[in-house]
Amino acid sequence: MKLSPGKNAPDVVNVLVEIPQGSNIKYEYDDEEGVIKVDRVLYTSMNYPFNYGFIPGTLEEDGDPLDVLVITNYQLYPGSVIEVRPIGILYMKDEEGEDAKIVAVPKDKTDPSFSNIKDINDLPQATKNKIVHFFEHYKELEPGKYVKISGWGSATEAKNRIQLAIKRVSGGQ
């Protein structure tokens, strides 16, 4: 069974959760073996502020699926799939190049708590600060690794990025 980006992409997309909110372990999905593997324990004394995964059936220029941070008030199990609404994008680079993160919330039917959040600017500033702080610092103690944040993008920018990443898989770009 091959998981798709979602029937209503880019407005609502599937996210395969790799890392639960609160974890200090970086898990990664191994496509060849179809399992989630431990990549590493974070070197810093930090935990992922929200659930983290990727949109299946997408491809970024670096060859990886498009990363997503799913804003919830609870942990999601690694390997679970949740339908989300993209609300923005965090532009950043790391030691390997561009590594933007889509920011999303559960679709309204899954969790109506986030129905008022339509765009990144609808998130509380404290939540955005927490996200930026995490990504600016989570690799600090790892030799040769770094992250540089360049800013936020809107829900429209996030959806455009998703469409482009889907086209890369389907041969459109």
From Swiss-Prot:
It catalyses: diphosphate + H2O = 2 phosphate + H(+). Substrate binds at K26, R40, Y52, Y138. Mg(2+) 1 binds at D62, D67, D99. Mg(2+) 2 binds at D67. Keywords: Cytoplasm, Hydrolase, Magnesium, Metal-binding. Its cofactor is Mg(2+). Signal peptide: none annotated. GO terms for molecular function: inorganic diphosphate phosphatase activity; magnesium ion binding. It comes from the Archaea. Its main location: cytoplasm. Pfam families: Pyrophosphatase (PF00719). InterPro entries: Pyrophosphatase (IPR008162), Pyrophosphatase_sf (IPR036649). One of its GO terms (cellular component) is cytoplasm. GO terms for biological process: phosphate-containing compound metabolic process. Its EC number is 3.6.1.1. It is found in: Cytoplasm. It is an enzyme of class 3 (hydrolase). Catalyzes the hydrolysis of inorganic pyrophosphate (PPi) forming two phosphate ions. NCBIfam families: PRK01250.1. Belongs to the PPase family. Homohexamer. This is Inorganic pyrophosphatase. It comes from Sulfolobus acidocaldarius (strain ATCC 33909 / DSM 639 / JCM 8929 / NBRC 15157 / NCIMB 11770). The lineage of its organism: Archaea, Thermoproteota, Thermoprotei, Sulfolobales, Sulfolobaceae.
